[in-house]
Swiss-Prot record:
This is NADH-quinone oxidoreductase subunit A. InterPro entries: NAD(P)H_OxRDtase_bac/plastid (IPR023043), NADH_UbQ/plastoQ_OxRdtase_su3 (IPR000440), NDAH_ubi_oxred_su3_sf (IPR038430). Keywords: Cell inner membrane, Cell membrane, Membrane, NAD, Quinone, Translocase, Transmembrane, Transmembrane helix, Transport, Ubiquinone. It comes from the Bacteria. The gene is nuoA. The lineage of its organism: Bacteria, Pseudomonadati, Pseudomonadota, Alphaproteobacteria, Rickettsiales. Pfam families: Oxidored_q4. It catalyses: a quinone + NADH + 5 H(+)(in) = a quinol + NAD(+) + 4 H(+)(out). One of its GO terms (molecular function) is NADH dehydrogenase (ubiquinone) activity. NDH-1 shuttles electrons from NADH, via FMN and iron-sulfur (Fe-S) centers, to quinones in the respiratory chain. The immediate electron acceptor for the enzyme in this species is believed to be ubiquinone. Couples the redox reaction to proton translocation (for every two electrons transferred, four hydrogen ions are translocated across the cytoplasmic membrane), and thus conserves the redox energy in a proton gradient. Gene3D superfamilies: NADH:ubiquinone/plastoquinone oxidoreductase, chain 3. It comes from Rickettsia prowazekii (strain Madrid E).
Length: 123
């Protein structure tokens, strides 16, 4: 069992790295707003379309079903991201790892069936 000082010594570089990453991220987001000059005019606020006047409004309505399909894609993409390492280490994780992944897949299948019955996939 690691003592507190050993634990701190092991995780201190990770904590420092995380702190520097957060600090740099915040600086990169805040500094442009503080240092830039803001000159708004009509031409800068319009969307650019290959040097021509815009043909239509850039803020057109977008069907919500595209978002549902995108969310489904993200969910099942994450499923694959969890399944690949699980399949590689299946020999070493034992029965508990197997049944926990089966439960995870069961929950995803139940969610997929629910969306299917609610008509989220019908166009």
């Amino acid at each position: 069992m690691l003592q507190n000082s050993e634990l701190l010594q092991e995780y201190l570089p990770i904590a420092i790295f995380f702190g520097i990453a957060v600090l740099l991220s915040v600086l990169i987001m805040i500094l442009p707003n503080l240092l830039s000059t803001k000159k708004y005019n009509k031409d800068k606020l319009e969307p650019y379309e290959c040097g021509f006047e815009p043909f239509s409004d850039a803020r057109s309505k977008f069907d919500i079903r595209f978002y549902l399909v995108a969310i489904l894609f993200i969910i099942f993409d994450l499923e694959i991201a969890f399944l690949v390492p699980w399949a590689i280490s299946l020999n070493t994780i034992g029965k508990m790892g197997f049944f926990s992944m089966m439960f995870f897949l069961f929950v995803l299948i139940i969610g997929f069936i629910y969306e299917w019955t609610k008509g989220a996939l019908d166009w």
